Amino acid sequence: MFDLSDQLITMGLWSISIGAFGAAVAGILLANTDFFLSQTEKATLDYLEETELKTIGEEPRLFKAKDLWERDGAVIMAVRRPGCFLCREEASGLSTLKPQLDQLGVPLYAIVKENIGNEVEHFQPYFNGKVFLDAKGQFYGPQKRKMMLLGLVRLGVWQNFRRAWKGGFEGNLEGEGLILGGMFVIGSGKQGILLEHREKEFGDKANLTAVLDAARKISKQTAQNDN
């Protein structure tokens, strides 16, 4: 009778262990789908153009975001965190488009949501364009999305880590880095938002070909307006 009780207890413990393991595996698999990701609300031109931005430098000044694209359109990176090595990798990749963007007459800008110490200064070597401060984080909305501990169990995040590490990019942990960033290609005047990429997980970059294709539409629109 005693042996039977021991066997039942052992079987029960094994069942609990197997069940817990199965639940953990199922949780990890589910975490690698888009089910738990923050929902994205697309920005509108009206929402973005009245955003108050600030220049970064010795004599900062305030201006409306629409000044960035009013005449020639713009490609704008909303940086999750300047010290993040994944963001630096993305900025470096985006900067490879600068010669083509210059030919199209389309400027390249970056937006940060905070300016801590020398973080923007240390980010600048990776980004071939001007950087501005969006203190209210408008470019990260209308619905700000965060990635918390979920990022640690997503295979895509670890693949992005590995890619950036292999590329030789380094960073730090200074500043807020949970609110996800994105990328915008905005046409001149009231042409509108031609491309909007929202980072769905750490290191989720915009497709550079899509960015350049959208920028070419700005060039055509500007040329038509000038004729």
UniProtKB/Swiss-Prot annotation:
Q: Specify whether Chaperone is a keyword of the entry.
A: no
Which CDD domains does the record match to this protein? PRX_like2 (cd02970)
Keywords, A to Z, come to:
Antioxidant, Cytoplasm, Redox-active center
Gene Ontology CC terms = cytoplasm
What top-level branch of life does the organism fall under? Answer: Eukaryota
Cytoplasm as a keyword of this entry, yes or no, is yes
Stretch list, region Thioredoxin fold:
13-111
User: Where does the UniProt annotation locate this protein?
Assistant: Cytoplasm
**List of catalytic residues:** C84 (redox-active), C87 (redox-active)
Transmembrane regions: none
Predominant cellular place of this UniProt entry's protein = cytoplasm
> From the Swiss-Prot or TrEMBL record, what is one GO molecular function term?
antioxidant activity
The function of this protein is: Involved in redox regulation of the cell. Acts as an antioxidant.
Which family does this protein fall into? Belongs to the peroxiredoxin-like PRXL2 family. PRXL2A subfamily.
List, alphabetically, the PANTHER family matched: PEROXIREDOXIN-LIKE 2A, PTHR28630
> What other facts are recorded?
The active site cysteines correspond to the redox-active cysteines of peroxiredoxins.
- Recorded protein name is Peroxiredoxin-like 2A
Species, as recorded: Xenopus laevis
